[in-house]
Amino acid sequence: VNSTSSFLYPVAMLMDAGIDPARDMKQIILAGSHANVITALAEGRVDIGGASFDSFEKAVKAGSIDPAKVRVLAKSEPIPYPPIAMHPALPSKVQQQLKGAFNSVHETPGITPDQIRGYGGHKVDRYDANFPESGMDAPAKKMTRVNDQVKAAIIKKASDR
C-alpha cells in the first residue's frame, strides 16, 4: 500500500475519476508487486490492476502478457523518481561538484547508456540534479489524497474474502 506506481497513483487516479475503491469495487486483491498484478491480469484473475508502465512493457517484451488481451485504461503523468539527497552541511563546492557529476554522467567517457540506471534499476537517459523541489509538489499532493483512512478501508475490503 506504499508503492507509488502500483498503489498510490492508481488509487488516486480512481478517486479523481469519482471511484471509491473500497466502496465501488466488488473485490480488492493486494497482489504485492507489479509482476504479481500483471500475472493476475494475464491469468484473468482480476479485472483491473495498477502497475508501472515500465513493468507492463517488460512483461509484454518477455511474452508474459498479451497486449491484445489487456487494455491500458490510463497512464499517469510522469512520476519523478525518488531524489538523491545530500546533507545541507556539505560544503557548497562539494554540492556543486556532485550535481555536476550527476548532470554530466551520460557524457562521461566509458559510460554507456546501459549503465545509467534509476529507481529499481530502470534505464534512464540522464540524471537531473537541478530538478526543483517544487517539482515534487504535484505528485506529493496527489498521493496525499490516499491517506491512512483510504488505505485502511482498502485493506479491510481486501481482507473480506
Where are these regions (language model features)?
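Bilobed "Venus flytrap"/periplasmic-binding protein-like clamshell domains
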Residues: 1-48, 54, 121
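Stable alpha-helical elements in mature extracytoplasmic
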Residues: 6, 10, 37, 52-56, ...
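Sec/Tat-exported extracytoplasmic proteins
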Residues: 17-18, 32, 45, 60-63, ...
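Short beta-strand->loop
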Residues: 24-27, 60-78
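Catalytic-face loop-and-helix region of soluble metabolic enzyme cores
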Residues: 82
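An extracytoplasmic/periplasmic, membrane-proximal ligand-sensing/linker region
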Residues: 86, 90-161
